[in-house]
From Swiss-Prot:
Tissue specificity statement from the Swiss-Prot or TrEMBL entry: Expressed within the abdominal ganglion in neurons R15, RB(HE), the two L9(G) gill motoneurons, and L40 interneuron, all are parts of autonomic control circuit that contributes to implementing a central command to coordinate autonomic activity with escape locomotion.
Species annotation: Aplysia californica (California sea hare)
Proregion positions: 27-48
Protein name: Neuroactive polyprotein R15
GO terms under cellular component: extracellular region
Coiled coil ranges: none
Organism ancestry: Eukaryota, Metazoa, Spiralia, Lophotrochozoa, Mollusca
């Protein structure tokens, strides 16, 4: 092939590459710009009924507490409540907020208990890791036999 034929092939491949890129980039870009502006109406279909307040919560006595205006939107599902508590009366709300760290009457574990379990688990993992390090030291030095204390500690 002569240089003119190579030049034409190069130009043709360059044009096809540009057209292909435009065809892949243009539709998603135009779709993104044609969407409505994000607002309340645009996301209304993504919310469930328990996430949207219909105004009736303002009339319920257990959704406000005092002049601070503490509102709870946990009428239907306890996952919406702070700390996962389902509260049905104002006195229950006050008790739940005051005794947040104690085991509640709702059957939920307190924060202190969960952190205690986590700490215990971490301690157990550290003990296991320490035992593995000791075992590896014993394996790496075969000429030194472990004492009876080391063996007893490893198998406890």
């Amino acid at each position: 092939m002569d240089s003119a034929g190579l030049h034409i092939n190069f130009r043709l491949s360059h044009v096809l590459t540009v057209v292909t890129c435009i065809l892949y980039i243009l539709p998603p870009t135009t779709t993104a710009y044609s969407l409505p502006a994000p607002g309340k109406a645009a996301f209304q279909h993504q919310l469930s009924k328990r996430d949207v307040s219909d105004g009736s919560a303002e009339r319920r006595p257990y959704t406000r507490m005092g002049s601070g205006g503490l509102k709870l939107h946990c009428q239907v599902h306890p996952a919406n409540c702070p700390g996962g508590l389902m509260v049905t009366k104002k006195s229950d709300l006050l008790g739940a907020l005051l005794s947040r760290n104690s085991p509640s009457s709702y059957g939920l574990p307190s924060r202190d208990m969960s952190t205690a379990y986590k700490r215990q688990d971490v301690r157990q993992q550290l003990r296991m890791f320490d035992d593995l390090v000791q075992l590896r030291k014993l394996i790496e030095t075969p000429s030194v036999y472990p004492s009876e204390e080391d063996e007893a500690r490893l198998y406890d």
